[in-house]
Regions:
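ATP-dependent adenylate-handling active sites, centered on carboxylate activation for C-N bond formation
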Residues: 1-161, 175-190, 201-203, 207-212, ...
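A short alpha-helix-loop-beta-strand transition element characteristic
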Residues: 164-171
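C-terminal catalytic/acceptor-binding lobe
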Residues: 193-194, 198
Length: 266
């Protein structure tokens, strides 16, 4: 997101600061992030590492203590995978499910990563009146029949010149990809280096609840168990696209594995 953040900063005239993170910082923060979150959910951990390091930099390098964040827009207006929703009813049910589970995934990430760095969040999309209004809209209007996900949200900002059109109509990218595709790839490669195939199979069999299904998920689970032994049921389930929908039966939570990802994240 670096180049897009620069574009927005130049457009609105904001004081722009960039935070770079290294592979060493990603790995060195992994245990802290898992302990902080109290989860072994794959996508929550991936996304939290970037947010944790950014919030840490804000705390250490600035006097800013209150942040605006964009959580809950996905739950209300759709993820990349909700392009596959078969109809409005299915979209609405999925949206309701995601809102009910906010505290276990996206809001868990934002709350912990921000507060541990002595910062506060303001979440405009979480305004109760706004949430009630959006959830009361005809869900058929939220289906991606416009060739662009989250069309209603984009359309709301189309007038007034709040954002350049290149940003407003940009393809949606996976959250953890916004800090760089290489971060997720690096985490996967690191996990692969920690276990042989035989070790992976035998260690996974130790867990009957929410059994790890990749070496990355096993790595996160084993770190989780060092801090929260025998408390796996703290996590209800892995965050994943709705596997009952055509096109969503995938084994990784990242939108990058979906057939409709296209130019997203470029």
């Amino acid at each position: 997101d670096l180049k897009y953040a620069r574009q927005v900063a130049d457009y609105i005239g904001s004081d722009h600061t960039e935070v770079y993170m290294t592979p060493d910082e990603v790995l060195s923060s992994l245990k802290n992030v898992i302990q902080l979150l109290g989860t072994y959910d794959i996508t929550t951990i991936r996304a939290s590492i970037g947010m944790y390091l950014v919030c840490k930099a804000i705390h250490n390098q600035t006097d800013i203590r209150v942040l605006l964040t964009g959580e809950i827009s996905d739950e209300l207006f759709g993820y990349k995978y909700t392009d596959f929703a078969p109809d409005g009813k299915a979209f609405q049910e999925e949206s309701q499910k995601r809102v009910r589970e906010l505290h276990m995934y996206d809001v868990l990430r934002a709350d912990r990563c921000i507060s541990v760095n002595s910062l506060e969040a303001r979440v405009p999309f979480g305004d109760l009146d706004f949430v009630k209004y959006v959830m009361a809209l005809d869900p058929e209007l939220k289906l991606n029949t416009y060739g662009k996900g989250k069309y209603l949200l984009r359309h709301a900002f189309e007038q007034g010149g709040y954002l350049p059109d290149t940003i407003l109509w940009r393809e949606k990218a996976a959250f953890s990809d916004a800090v760089g595709h290489s971060m997720v790839d690096y985490l996967k490669e690191y996990a692969e280096s920690q276990y042989t195939d035989e070790e992976f199979k035998s260690r996974c069999e130790r867990y009957t609840y929410a059994r790890p299904f990749t070496k990355e998920s096993l790595l996160y689970r084993e770190i989780f168990e060092t801090f929260y032994p025998g408390q796996a049921e703290m996590v209800v389930d892995f965050w994943m696209p709705n596997k009952t929908w055509k096109g969503c039966n995938v084994n990784d939570p990242s939108a990058r594995v979906l057939s409709n990802y296209g130019d997203s994240g470029k």
